[in-house]
């Protein structure tokens, strides 16, 4: 039996992920966890979802809960709760208020679902991944951040439009911070197995503009509709289904590093990993050119500094 708990299920991301997963008809039970004040609203969301699922003859158990005891038996616990990002805010602006939420939930997960995989979506996700890891006491392979998986999908879309190629043919990756210090690995990006730079259209590619557009993708959506929704939700569902089905895909997620990539340690960053039913099977080696390596080190310094400062602040309270 596969049981998923979504903490923050009353929010846009949480409820959309719940419906995405239910539609796939591979999850047996989904606990939609929220604060008591949102409990009735979540019940309403579930009733609405059941009507939609009935049209497809899908039978998935959905339950609204505000009781931590309902986490018991969860294979994966998703944390989406937090202060939402608004236009003009960096993800790091959210660190202080959101860290307290992640701390509280991580403690409860450790008590009620000690064998689960924790998946962090709350921003700044790289910092929150470290907070969840240290608070829960879990093995680092079982604490994962959404991180650059979403950024990699966004880059894939941008390249698909520029090169007029089906996105399935594009293999690219973004690593580092899920934020201003993300690192697109264009030097190793391929289309149909051929290096990006080999295509004549590459001559017309304004790389600095591409990277800037990529970094501003989330903010651009927020400025127009108030929040990101479908992209993050489907990226999250992709990660959850990969873990739940043990399909061993290589995806880029935020994980705590201890020297595995370029000697970077004591910080959570986005790197490619093989995902399995137990979380991260292993980190996958990757190639970077000198410029990308420098940017990766910059990302490590930035995220590590923020994490240290935040931990110091939390320890004083």
From Swiss-Prot:
It is an enzyme of class 1 (oxidoreductase). GO terms for molecular function: L-lactate dehydrogenase activity; L-malate dehydrogenase (NAD+) activity; L-malate dehydrogenase (NADP+) activity. Substrate binds at residues 85, 91, 123, 154. Its EC number is 1.1.1.299. The active site is at 178 (proton acceptor). Disulfide bonds: none annotated. InterPro entries: L-lactate/malate_DH, Lactate/malate_DH_C, Lactate/malate_DH_N, Lactate_DH/Glyco_Ohase_4_C, NAD(P)-bd_dom_sf. GO terms for biological process: lactate metabolic process; tricarboxylic acid cycle. The keyword NAD applies. Coiled coil: none annotated. NADP(+) binds at residues 8-14, 98, 121-123. It catalyses: (S)-malate + NADP(+) = oxaloacetate + NADPH + H(+); (S)-malate + NAD(+) = oxaloacetate + NADH + H(+). Keywords: NAD, NADP, Oxidoreductase, Tricarboxylic acid cycle. Belongs to the LDH/MDH superfamily. Catalyzes the reversible oxidation of malate to oxaloacetate. This is Malate dehydrogenase. It comes from Methanosphaera stadtmanae (strain ATCC 43021 / DSM 3091 / JCM 11832 / MCB-3).
């Amino acid at each position: 039996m596969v049981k998923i708990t979504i903490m923050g299920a009353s929010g846009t991301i949480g409820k959309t992920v719940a419906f995405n997963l239910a539609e796939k008809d591979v999850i047996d039970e989904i606990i939609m966890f929220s604060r008591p004040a949102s409990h009735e609203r979540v019940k309403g969301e579930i009733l609405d979802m059941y009507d939609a699922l009935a049209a497809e003859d899908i039978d998935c158990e959905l339950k609204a809960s505000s009781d931590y005891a309902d986490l018991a038996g969860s294979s994966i616990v998703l944390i989406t709760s937090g202060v939402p990002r608004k236009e003009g805010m960096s993800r790091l602006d959210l660190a202080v208020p959101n860290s307290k939420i992640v701390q509280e939930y991580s403690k409860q997960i450790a008590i009620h679902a000690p064998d689960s995989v924790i998946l962090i979506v709350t921003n700044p996700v790289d910092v929150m991944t470290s907070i969840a890891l240290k608070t829960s006491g879990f093995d680092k392979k079982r604490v994962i951040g959404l991180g650059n998986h979403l950024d990699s999908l966004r880059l894939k879309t941008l390249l698909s439009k520029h090169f007029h190629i089906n996105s399935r043919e594009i293999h690219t990756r973004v690593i580092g911070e899920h934020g201003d210090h993300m690192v697109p690995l264009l030097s190793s990006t391929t289309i149909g197995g051929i290096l990006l730079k080999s295509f004549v259209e590459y001559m017309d590619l304004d790389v600095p503009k591409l990277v800037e557009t990529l970094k501003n993708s989330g903010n651009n959506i927020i400025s127009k509709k108030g929040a990101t929704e479908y992209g993050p939700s489907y990226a999250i569902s992709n990660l959850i289904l990969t873990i739940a089905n043990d399909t061993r895909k290589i995806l880029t997620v935020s994980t705590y590093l201890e020297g595995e990539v370029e000697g970077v340690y004591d910080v959570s960053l986005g790197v490619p990993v093989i995902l399995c039913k137990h979380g991260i099977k292993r980190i996958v080696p990757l190639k970077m050119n000198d410029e990308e390596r420098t940017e990766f080190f910059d990302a490590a310094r930035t995220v590590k500094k923020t994490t240290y400062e935040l931990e110091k602040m939390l320890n004083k309270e």
